[in-house]
Each structure stands twice: as C-alpha cells, then as structure tokens.
From Swiss-Prot:
Glycans are attached at N46, N59, N199, N221. One of its GO terms (molecular function) is identical protein binding. The keyword rRNA processing does not apply. Low expression in liver, three times higher in kidney and abundant in testis. Belongs to the EPCIP family. Disulfide bonds: none annotated. The gene is Epcip. This is Exosomal polycystin-1-interacting protein. Likely to be involved with PKD1 in the detection, sequestration and exocytosis of senescent mitochondria.
Length: 230
C-alpha cells in the first residue's frame, strides 16, 4: 500500500494537493498557457496593449487579446517595456491598439493625436469624467469597455470603412479622417453615437478650441472628414 501511495504522489501535478483546489497562481499559469497556445495555432498578428502602472506607461505586444484590465495576465504573456510619460511621442499603429486607463490625463497623453485605425479603450476604474474631447487620426473602428453600472459596458462603433491608401504610412500630418472623442461617454449614461462632417478644409478656424491644430498645423490644401464620437 505504501508503494501505491508513493507512486500516486509522484504522478501528482505540483499545482495540486490531495483533496484541495488548484492555487490561484496555477490557474493563472494554465490560463496563460492556453492563451499562448491559441495565439500559436491561430497565428494571429500581435496586438499592441498600452496601460499605466504607477508613474510609468507599459507598452506591450500580445499574441492575443487580453481580458480587460487583467494586468497580471498581460505581464505574464505579453512582451512589455516601460516608457516614461515624457517620452511618449506622436506615433502610428497599423494593427489593433488597446489602451487600459484610469484617468483622462493619462489617456490624453497616450493618444496625443495618435494615428490608429482599430482602437479599443478600457476604463479600469469607476471614475466619472466631464465633457472633454481627444483627437484621434484615421480611426475606423472604436470599441470601449467600462465598469459602469449602465448595461452598455462594452460597445463598438464603425466610424468609416474608407481607406486612406498609403497616407497611413506617411505620418500623422497626412491624416484625412479625424475623430473627436468625448471622454464623458465612459460614464456609461448612454449608448455610443457619432456623426461626421465632410469636406472641411480649415481645421484651425473651424475647431479653434483644439490646440492640436495650432501647434501642428494641418495642410490647408486638402479636404478632411471630421467625426464627433459621444
């Protein structure tokens, strides 16, 4: 009987003990292994995830989508590097971009008139925000996730499906499609909505409250499509 018990113990996984449940660490590890395996078999392009941790910003490349605001899982299976807020620059993302945030100032610092087509914004907290607009360039699809009490915690919006050709790869100044995002939508008081205005040629004069166009003037010899998301 003793040899039988010894053999049984030798073949028992270290994540388990007799008559007990698996530890939380083992569950997290098994979940991560499953996600990595899924990403391997689907051969999906890595997604970019940006979130704040303390006074730094974490920029991560992930094999698959990570559950909203699961920082432990993101650090476990994604390849991440820390960036100081002062080092953030205007940039472009050619794939999916997900941002987890807890305050609007950080979100504004990360976006900073970013050039991105497919964006997901997840509010990892219960803060409420006043009306304030952030500018995004080239946005085609927006997804949001909040922890609000409103039933519409997760919403999606298709802004447009028109392509800008090669302009996406020439820098944010060449952007033809500009979206203004009202951060009050994260309060979850209503469903996600938008409206667009075509053929706008003078952004600085038509939208004087946005400093983006004063510090970095947009070319005036072309027509823009402006979308307001609220």
């Amino acid at each position: 009987m003793d040899w039988l018990m010894r053999e049984k113990q030798e073949h028992t996984s270290p994540c388990w003990t007799r008559m007990t449940s698996p530890s939380s660490f083992c569950l997290l590890l098994l979940q991560a292994l499953g996600i990595v395996a899924l990403g391997h078999f689907t051969k999906a392009q890595n997604n970019t995830l940006i979130f704040t941790k303390g006074n730094t910003i974490r920029n991560c490349s992930c094999p698959v989508d990570i559950r909203d605001c699961d920082y432990s899982l993101a650090n476990l299976i994604c390849s991440c590097k820390s960036i100081l807020p002062s080092a953030m620059e205007q940039t472009s993302y050619h794939g999916h971009l997900t941002i987890w945030f807890t305050d609007i100032s950080t979100l504004g610092h990360v976006l900073k008139f970013t050039l991105v087509q497919d964006l997901k914004l997840s509010l990892c907290g219960s803060s409420t925000f006043p009306t304030k607009y952030l500018a995004i360039c080239g946005l085609q699809r927006l997804r949001i996730h909040t922890k609000a009490r409103h039933p519409s915690r997760g919403q999606s919006l298709l802004i447009h499906s028109r392509r800008e050709g090669s302009s996406l790869y020439k820098g944010w100044q060449t952007c033809m499609f500009i979206s203004f995002l009202d951060v009050a939508l994260f309060n979850g008081d209503s469903s996600l909505k938008s409206y667009s205005i075509d053929n706008i040629s003078s952004l600085a004069s038509d939208f004087p409250d946005f400093s983006y166009f004063k510090t970095s003037p947009m070319p005036s010899n072309r027509s823009y499509v402006v979308t307001v998301i609220y």
